């Protein structure tokens, strides 16, 4: 069924992501290819040296403002798609990292969204791309394996500020090493994006067909997917 295929795609993507995380951990955290020692052309630095923040382009829209908009492009909040709107602020592949509200999981790792295409973001998520050899995909893996509980402020409304995020210590591999790693993980993330796009199409198809199937307007036996 359509629902089973969507679930299968999600399971495959989870497995692909775990594979990519294992590759990152082996190479850049455990340093297994380098006998556990950081190569001399790598350096210790901070997140500010490897990310570009696009937070200044964010524009929050109230639920009232969104109510009459045609539902075309995803409208992201700190943790997920909150709504759909008829315009977009960004177009491309970006990493969203929760800024306030729910910003870490129960183990202290940041709430991340790997997004692509045309979309809008409210002011509750940091919008990130990479620099100095770091791609969005490599940043996703880095942050998914970095506990950030210590930089969260605010008891009532948890927050990860730009300043605290930028000051997180990181290992910065050489650009050659980053390029080599990127060539390995890009096909994995390409497959993740393709499966996610397929699931989105299947979800749209299901949402269109289901009411017509339930009403008897169309016969399930005549459907070809």
Language model feature labels by segment:
Residues 1-60, 65-77, 171, 175-221:
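Non-catalytic DNA-recognition/assembly elements of restriction-modification systems
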Residues 39, 43-173, 224-225:
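DNA target-recognition domains and sequence-specific DNA-contacting regions of bacterial/archaeal
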């Amino acid at each position: 069924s359509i629902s089973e295929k969507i679930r299968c795609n999600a399971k495959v993507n989870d497995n692909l992501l775990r594979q990519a995380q294992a590759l990152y951990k082996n190479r850049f955290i455990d340093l297994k290819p380098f006998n556990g020692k950081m190569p001399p052309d790598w350096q210790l630095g901070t997140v500010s040296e490897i990310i570009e923040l696009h937070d200044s382009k964010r524009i929050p829209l109230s639920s009232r403002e969104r109510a009459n908009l045609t539902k075309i492009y995803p409208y992201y909040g700190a943790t997920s798609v909150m709504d759909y709107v008829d315009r977009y602020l960004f177009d491309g592949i970006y990493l969203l990292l929760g800024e306030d509200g729910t910003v870490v999981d129960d183990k202290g790792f940041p709430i991340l969204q790997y997004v692509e295409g045309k979309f809008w973001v409210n002011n509750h998520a940091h919008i990130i791309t990479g620099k100095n050899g770091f791609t969005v995909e490599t940043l996703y893996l880095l942050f998914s394996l970095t506990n950030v509980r210590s930089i969260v402020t605010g008891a009532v409304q948890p927050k990860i500020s730009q300043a605290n995020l930028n000051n997180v210590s990181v290992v910065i591999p050489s650009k050659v090493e980053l390029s080599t790693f990127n060539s390995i993980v890009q096909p994995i993330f390409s497959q993740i994006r393709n499966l996610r796009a397929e699931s989105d199409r299947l979800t749209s198809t299901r949402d269109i067909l289901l009411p017509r199937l339930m009403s008897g307007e169309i016969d399930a036996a005549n459907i070809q997917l």
